[in-house]
């Protein structure tokens, strides 16, 4: 007869122990099917655009030209199939696969894969739902009080900003946002950016928040230099919004010297929507209180898992993250990083030849990215975006207001020079 006093999680683990190895092996067919497709993935050696055939590996409608990976990515077919396989397996025995040992082991494997891809320890990686959630965990969990200050610039995305304002109202610390000279971005140097951050620190600044790559002009901040400067001037925590970087460029968080780094896997990692990652430097974890209150929390005391929402969630999405990462790593071996840079250079050359357009993004690659903005004269960027989508199937992000009228493009490896040529032809 079962012990009625045995905690639910302990009971589940105990009851499934004998089934563990066999149940875990049930994941193998899904993983093997994915691996077989991945091993056959290669860019074509022939033709003028060897990456063009990659589009067939995605689910995009044939009449859509997608230049908006910076807002939300699209999942490769094989990654989506793996996700469906995990979900189908879960539904064969929801109790076993949602709450028992096999799923725990598979989740630990995914955590290790994510940590390796980002250049940090598995005991420093928290599964979240998105970047905004990660900053809510930090703003709510750090012991910030009256007299403390959080600083960030106007380049900060709202998802990395609003939580600080919310908790400041209830706990009394201050939040200060300084103006970033966005119009000067094409001519800024790394030293200029570090100096700008330095000028806006005070002896009360405990937290500096900044994007790795911002979502307006795609400026790649020199994080190591900024983190070293900030720490040397008494800033306790450097927290980074990496939503636009992980999957777009190679990232090694340990080498960046930051304390927290959050990202969303639904953008450049091309993973299922609803999965995010938060790096918490080992020595910084003790400074953050968990804000989730859930059952069985004592089981994870002393572990980074204490910061996760362990209620019922779609764990198939979490497992698929490892497959999405494997897909991106495969593309890297095929020259994906160089491809994205080449597309950016091609767009920049097209802008330079048109007097009604202005390049608003960094000019040097060390500060640049696969997200870039084009200043537009004589037409409202919102109307241009609407017309280009409704009549021609182009998807990109317009920004308009405060004397800022731009088209933001964020291209990925399967986009082509032909699509770019057509874009500028339609733009006029």
Model-inferred region functions:
Residues 2-7, 12-428:
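Pyridoxal 5′-phosphate
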């Amino acid at each position: 007869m079962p012990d009625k006093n045995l905690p639910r999680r302990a009971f589940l683990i105990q009851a499934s122990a004998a089934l563990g190895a066999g149940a875990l092996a049930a994941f193998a067919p899904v993983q093997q099917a994915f691996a077989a497709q991945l091993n056959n993935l290669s860019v074509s050696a022939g033709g003028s655009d060897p990456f063009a055939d990659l589009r067939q590996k995605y689910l995009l409608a044939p009449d859509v030209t997608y230049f908006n990976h910076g807002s939300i990515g699209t999942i490769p077919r094989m990654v989506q199939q793996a996700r469906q396989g995990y979900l189908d397996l879960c539904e064969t025995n929801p109790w076993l696969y949602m709450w028992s040992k096999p799923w725990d082991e598979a989740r630990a494997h995914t955590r290790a894969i994510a940590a390796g891809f980002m250049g940090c320890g598995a005991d420093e990686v928290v599964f979240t739902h998105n970047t905004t959630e990660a900053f809510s965990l930090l703003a709510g969990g750090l012991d910030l009080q009256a007299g403390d200050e959080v600083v960030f610039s106007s380049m900060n995305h709202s998802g990395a900003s609003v939580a600080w304002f919310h908790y400041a109202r209830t706990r009394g610390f201050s939040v200060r946002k300084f103006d970033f000279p966005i119009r000067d971005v094409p001519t800024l140097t790394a030293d200029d950016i570090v100096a700008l951050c330095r000028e806006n620190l005070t002896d009360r600044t405990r937290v500096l928040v900044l994007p790795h790559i911002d979502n307006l002009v795609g400026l790649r901040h020199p994080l190591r230099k900024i983190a070293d400067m900030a720490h040397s001037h008494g800033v306790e925590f450097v927290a980074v919004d990496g939503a636009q970087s992980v999957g777009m460029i190679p990232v090694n968080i340990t080498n960046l010297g930051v304390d927290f780094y959050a990202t969303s896997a639904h953008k450049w990692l091309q993973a299922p929507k609803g999965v995010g990652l938060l790096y918490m430097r080992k020595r910084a974890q003790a400074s953050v209180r968990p804000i989730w209150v859930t059952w069985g929390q004592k089981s994870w005391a002393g572990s980074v898992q204490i910061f996760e929402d362990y209620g019922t969630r779609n764990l198939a999405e979490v497992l698929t993250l490892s497959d999405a990462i494997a897909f991106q790593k495969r593309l890297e071996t095929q020259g994906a990083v160089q491809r994205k840079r080449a597309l950016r250079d091609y767009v920049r050359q097209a802008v330079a030849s048109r007097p009604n357009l202005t390049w608003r993004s960094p000019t040097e690659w060390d500060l640049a990215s696969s997200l870039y903005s084009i200043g537009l004269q004589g037409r409202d960027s919102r109307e241009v975006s609407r017309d280009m989508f409704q009549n021609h199937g182009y998807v990109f992000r317009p920004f308009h207001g405060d004397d800022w009228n731009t088209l933001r493009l964020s291209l990925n490896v399967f986009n082509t020079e032909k699509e770019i040529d057509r874009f500028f032809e339609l733009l006029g």
